[in-house]
């Protein structure tokens, strides 16, 4: 059930379930009462307020889980340094997003499901979970077939150890430092098509748990491989 809030005369709050409304009223509520940012800057301002003063953010924007992000194309650095953020945003519409680099950079407490996200338009996931130390959620269902950048994607994501073997990484060209000090990761990724990758330098540096066969990988395009398995 989707719980939404309505402010009455700027003072009183009432809460209703969206599913209980007639269809026509649902559309009106979605159009006028659910926060729908038009730009990254508008969304970033709302996120900052949410992380700094949740009560004020609730009054101004409603709950972050209900925001309509369907117009946003760039979510880079969105939760950068939001060290205490840990709210569910799995219902966000990210289908228009192309850039998610550094999205959860040092969001050290974040560990919420993201498996409902449609990331099929995203091309850049570089450093997406950089130092997102608590994150360990299933994302194997993601369509990453458009992604070209995964450099440092899980850098320092020390808790992450979920399967990602279903990912289509055939468009990725840069995996440098992808699992750098991702110290818990030990999932089979030997089936990946890495034939387009040119950079695998320090890819598993400090990934002390990783012990999976990758001998079937086609490394014919790789030009940078230094320190791939350095401790």
Whereabouts are the PLM-identified features?
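CRL adaptor-proximal regions
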Residues: 1-20, 31
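Negatively charged
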Residues: 16-231
């Amino acid at each position: 059930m989707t719980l939404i809030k309505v402010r009455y005369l700027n003072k009183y709050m009432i809460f209703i379930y969206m599913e209980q409304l007639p269809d026509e009223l649902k559309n009106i509520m979605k159009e006028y009462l659910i926060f729908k940012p038009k730009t990254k800057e508008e969304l970033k301002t709302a996120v900052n307020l949410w992380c700094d003063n949740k009560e004020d953010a609730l009054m101004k924007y409603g709950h972050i889980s209900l925001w309509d992000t369907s117009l946003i194309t760039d979510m880079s650095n969105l939760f950068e340094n939001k060290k205490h953020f840990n709210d569910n945003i799995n219902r966000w519409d990210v289908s228009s997003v192309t850039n998610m680099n550094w999205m959860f950079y040092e969001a050290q407490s974040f560990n919420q499901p993201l498996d409902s996200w449609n990331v099929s338009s995203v091309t850049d996931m570089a450093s997406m979970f950089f130092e997102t130390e608590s994150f360990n959620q299933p994302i194997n269902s993601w369509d990453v077939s458009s992604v070209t950048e995964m450099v440092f994607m899980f850098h320092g994501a020390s808790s992450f150890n979920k399967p990602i073997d279903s990912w289509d990484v055939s468009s990725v060209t840069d995996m440098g430092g992808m699992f750098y000090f991702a110290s818990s990761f030990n999932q089979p990724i030997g089936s990946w098509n890495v034939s387009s990758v040119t950079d695998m330098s320090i890819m598993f540096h400090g990934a002390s748990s990783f012990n999976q066969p990758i001998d079937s990988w086609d490394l014919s395009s790789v030009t940078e491989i230094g320190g791939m398995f350095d401790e």
